Structures are given as structure tokens and as C-alpha cells.
Amino acid sequence: MGVLRSTQSMQAEVEEMRAALLHGHGGGAAAAAAAGWRPSAGDADVKRTAGGDGGAAGPRTVCVTGGISFVGFAVVDRLLRHGYTVRLALETQEDLDKLREMEMFGEDGRDGVWTVMANVTDPESLHRAFDGCAGVFHTSAFVDPGGMSGYTKHMASLEAKAAEQVIEACVRTESVRKCVFTSSLLACVWRQNYPHDRRFPTIIDENCWSDESFCRDNKLWFALGKTAAEKTAWRAARGRDLKLVTVCPALVTGPGFRRRNSTASIAYLKGARAMLADGLLATASVETVAEAHVRVYEAMGDNTAGGRYICYDHVVKRPEEFAELERQLGIPRRAAAAAAAQDSGDRPARFDLCRQKLARLMSTRRRCTYDDYYSVAFD
């Protein structure tokens, strides 16, 4: 969802995106061009297309929703490095304006990037955007920059509805065979904690789901939205002619994440002290998250990837690390909160996060197939 902002704010974000892109390729226009992102000549517009009219259709053509977001932008960048042709599904004129100001694209999709306007709650526009693509990366999410936490109960409901529309559009579009869905680690970690209930797993892995009632009762709207959206996606894909994989990243960090991903980050950190105490607060570099998306997508082609994948780089264990996260995001740190965080650092964590499934996939593709696309259980 787009939000009107000041020209100065938008320009600062554009410059950060441009710098991050060039830095990722080693700097310089030549490096960007070699990877498929080229500076445009003069004031060339970003091309707007509709459905199959734009971008060469084929097995290396994919569509990315939310491609101008922090994660979506990194996924597009990584896809181009892997030789894919990408359609960016944009929702607002502001998103299109950002791309124009970046001047990183050539005309008529010559750089491997095309754009199409698509509303993730409108199945017809999604169908047109996906037509001719072999796969879809659904990275878009709803945020409410006017909200105190960056995310509201209404946003959670919208995200679940959008997930259903995206999957239905994928199923309806004949060319689409695979979908990589961006969820969150928060869809795995929030449950009512019964200290004496030995049935509750110590290891938190892809088999664990957050309890929607618990999230609702504690107003953990971001976690609720991600959990409900992912469950909705799995229900919609079950028994259909579509391969679905979900990536569940931890708090996504990286260059400029305070400006470019602040609302989602602040929403993610609601309840962070409890996660810190339980050993469940983790971070993931945006580059790691993007690479995970592409790697699972490619592994889906030979049935060596399926189900859910938890993605993180680092588990935050010390109060000092948590304080630094808050500082980077500009979150006021109250004395009581600081004391609570300090106390949590003195207690052993009750849970262990597990990322072995993704680690195995990222380390090698030469392994036996053991995943089942429709074995995800949450009911």
C-alpha cells in the first residue's frame, strides 16, 4: 500500500536504493549493467506493461509482487544476477516514480526488468501480471505508516485476503507453475507458553506455527497477519496444480533498513523482549533472504525443495544487541524496558531456533528429495 510522503523523504529513499544496488554489484554503472541493471539514457521512462504484452515469456521469466519493497527489491536484484527476466508488479504511482528517479533501467525491458501495475487484492490484475511468467515471488505486504506499530489488525486481515488472491491468480494463470511466498519467522514462534507442558517443542522449526488466538489476544498484529496469510496460502494451494514454498525470515536488516523497512521492523519487534528472553529474537540480512528465495525457487524445479523454510543469520542473545537494534530503528528505550532486557539476558533460553532445512538446501543441491509440497500441517 502506498503512502504520500515528502519529496525529500522519497528522494532520500531512492538514493539509498540506488547506492545499495550499486554496492551489491561491487559499485559503478558497469557492474550494474553486467548484472542486468543498467542506467537509463536521459529521462527514459520505465516501461509499463500489462500481462503478456511486456517481457519475454518463458521458463526464466518471473513476476515479483512488492518489488520496490526492501525485501522485494533485493529479490529482484538477486534474480537478475541469476539470469532471470523480471516483471515488477507495482501497486501505486509512487512506486513507479521511485523507479523512474532511480534511472537504473533501460527502455522497453532491455535490461531484463519490466513493470506492470497490479493490485494484490484484484485477481484480474494479478492474472494479467502473471500471464507468461513461469513463477511468482509474492513479497508484498501491507503496512500502515500512520499506526503506532506500523501494522494494524485491519492490515492483518488484508494480508490474508491478498494471499488468497495471489495463489488463486497463480493457479488460474496457465504459465505459472511455482510460487515462492514471503512469510515470517513470527508465523512460527508465538504460542501460549505452558512451562510444564512437555509437548511444547524446545526446537522451533518449520513444523511450528504461531497461535492466531494468542497473537490476537496480545495484539501481535504483524505476527497474526503473517501467520494467517501463510496458512491461507497453503489452504488455497492444497491439491492444486501449483508448487508452493514459503520462506520465513527473521527481522530483515541491511543497509538503509531503518528508512526503507522501518514500519515492518518496528511491527516485528512488538513483543521483542519476550522473544529475547526465550531465545527467539533473530535477524536476517536482506541479501541472505533474497538468496534464499532464489535458491528455493530453483530447487523446486527438480523437487528438492518444498514446504516452509526458516531463514535467519543471527540469534540476538545479549541485551546490548537488542538495545542496538532499538537504537538503529529510533525506538525510545525506557529504563524499565532496559532492566527487563538485562534480566532476560541472565536466563537461559527456553527454545532453540532451527534453520537446518534451509542450510542444507543452500549448501548443496545434491541430496535426496524428502520434501512434500502439500505436507504442511497447521490445523
Swiss-Prot record:
Gene name of the record: SNL6
Main EC class the enzyme belongs to: oxidoreductase
Secretion signal span: none
EC number: 1.2.-.-
GO MF annotation, one: oxidoreductase activity, acting on the CH-OH group of donors, NAD or NADP as acceptor
Active site: 226 (proton donor)
Consequence of gene disruption: No visible phenotype under normal growth conditions, but mutant plants have reduced lignin content and increased sugar extractability. Mutant plants show enhanced susceptibility to the bacterial blight pathogen Xanthomomas oryzae pv. oryzae (Xoo).
Record key words, sorted: Lignin biosynthesis, NADP, Oxidoreductase, Plant defense
Entry-linked InterPro entries: 3Beta_OHSteriod_DH/Estase, NAD(P)-bd_dom_sf, NAD(P)_dehydrat-like
Physiological role: Involved in defense response. Required for NPR1/NH1-mediated resistance to the bacterial blight pathogen Xanthomomas oryzae pv. oryzae (Xoo). Required for pathogenesis-related (PR) genes expression. May be involved in lignin biosynthesis.
The organism's taxonomic lineage, starting at the top: Eukaryota, Viridiplantae, Streptophyta, Embryophyta, Tracheophyta
PANTHER family per UniProt: CINNAMOYL-COA REDUCTASE-LIKE SNL6, NAD DEPENDENT EPIMERASE/DEHYDRATASE
Taxonomy, superkingdom: Eukaryota
GO biological process, any: steroid biosynthetic process
Binding positions (NADP(+)): 66-72, 98, 119-120, 139-141, 226, 249-252
Stated family: Belongs to the 3-beta-HSD family.
Protein name from the UniProt record: Cinnamoyl-CoA reductase-like SNL6
